UniProtKB/Swiss-Prot annotation:
The keyword Cell division does not apply. It comes from Candida albicans (strain SC5314 / ATCC MYA-2876) (Yeast). Belongs to the GINS2/PSF2 family. The keyword Nucleus applies. This is DNA replication complex GINS protein PSF2. InterPro entries: GINS_A (IPR021151), GINS_bundle-like_dom_sf (IPR036224), GINS_Psf2 (IPR007257), PSF2_N (IPR056784).
């Protein structure tokens, strides 16, 4: 399937998920496993009931084989996410501090490791949805303050930036064209004024 032209420079959701699965996460192995060398990485020696950091994709494989429990990130709790939601409301010009892949990580863990989470899945989904919608409204309001040279996206995640990109790039291109035209007209007007002044002196 050929994507629309305005989406061809964007990452696909599956690509963002793939990138997110390379994030390190803590697991609690249920069995001891010897070190495994892989292309580009290796799984360290795992001891039963001893916490270890591994890429998320490794954790998901071990989890599916009932060989480990996943220790959820500290931010993936109802209490923490509600605090970030309140921050979003209190600070309309700022985005709260969340991990680069918080949306994808939370989605993966809610689907693949719900039994390892400390809070009920439905409550987590609800607060994540509220938080995401609030940030989306703020980011769309921010588009109104675009200028020809930059946009402030501090605090947005990869998925959030990827969703905004099809709207931001065309708008910035138009603004840049308007800016260049204005600058060109200003220079031409200045040149004309200098020529007129020179003609007056000659007279």
């Amino acid at each position: 399937m050929v994507l629309p032209k305005n989406l061809q420079g964007n990452l696909m959701p599956s690509e963002i998920t793939f990138l997110a699965e390379n994030e390190l996460i803590t697991i609690l192995p249920r069995y001891s496993i010897k070190k495994i060398d892989l292309i580009g990485t290796s799984i360290p020696n795992l001891r039963a009931m001893r916490r270890e950091l591994v890429p998320l994709w490794v954790a998901l494989i071990l989890k599916s084989q009932d060989k480990c429990s996943i220790v959820p990130p500290k931010w993936l709790t109802v209490a923490y996410l509600k605090e970030r939601y309140e921050d979003e409301i209190r600070k309309p010009l700022q985005f709260s501090d969340l991990p680069w892949n918080w949306l994808e990580l939370s989605k993966i863990l809610l689907e693949k490791a719900p039994d390892d989470l400390s809070d009920p899945v439905d409550q987590l989904r609800s607060v994540i949805q509220d938080l995401r919608e609030t940030r989306l409204v703020k980011s769309k309001k921010g588009l109104k303050e675009l200028n020809e040279s930059n946009i402030q996206l501090n605090g947005l995640s990869l998925l959030e930036i990827n969703e905004l990109r099809p709207f931001v790039i065309p708008v910035m291109n138009k603004l840049r064209q308007l800016y260049d035209t204005t600058q060109s007209n200003t220079i031409n007007a200045d040149d004309q004024d200098m020529e007129d002044a020179s003609d007056d002196e000659d007279v």
